[in-house]
Amino acid sequence: MEINYYQLQIFNARAKRYSTEGEENTLGYMNFDGVPSLGNAPKQLIKDKTSLADFYLSSSDLGSRKIISSRVKELFERIRLENVRYIPCPIHQGKKVFKEFWITDVIHFDDNEVDFNLSKFELCEGWVEEEVNGIPVKFGERFTEIKFQNLGEKIEFEKNKLNHLSKIRTVTLFIKQDCLFPFIYLKEFGIYDIIISYKLKEAIQQQKMDKGIEFKPLEIPEEEWGGPNGLRKQFYS
């Protein structure tokens, strides 16, 4: 099966919060509820003496939001408009300020584009085996493969069948072959990278916007991708 979607993984150093006394009405974590966030992007600081890139991770207080350059924004807006708001987010580097940057505010997620027939999940069950004076001191765990027919079934299972020590782990994730979106965002699978199509990957590379980023095939599990013997070596020497 051909690879049709990739995780756009950003390895440029994470921006840091540039504190400004009296700064008000600033963004925080994204709520993943589709409601547009209120406020302005807090000032973001990157390392001195590094050339600018087109993608950055935002400071940790902003969670999974991404910082992108104006030219990336223009590329993305040419091919899809309704799923992300782009909020001005100047980048500070020493005494310099670069205004041509934006931070993402995702208002539409595409979890229904996941192919549940091909995707694989693991049920990670945890429980308390022993307590001392009411304090858990010994735990048990079990890992089993689990299948879901659709997104609703997965959400319902997680809501009603799991205790606080258990979770569903995504092992391999496939996007439907008939998905037409060039890039998507997901919220229910523990993957918060921008997911992009092969064509968009090619466009980013051709326009030399790929400094400090890598494209991990979405279908390859993390444990098979990284490490000294991982499949990443086939893509990045």
Range-by-range predicted roles:
Residues 1-61:
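N-terminal ordered "arm"
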Residues 7, 83-88, 195, 214-217:
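A structural signal for short, well-ordered beta-strand segments and their strand-loop junctions
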Residues 57-64, 188-192:
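Extended, non-catalytic structural segments that build the interaction scaffolds
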Residues 60-126:
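Aromatic- and glycine-enriched beta-alpha-beta binding-site module
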Residues 18-22, 113-237:
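Acidic, proline/glycine-rich low-complexity IDRs
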Residues 41-43, 71-74, 87-93, 170-171, ...:
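Intrinsically disordered, low-complexity boundary segments flanking structured domains
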Residues 4-6, 100-102, 192:
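Short beta-strand micro-motifs in enzyme catalytic cores
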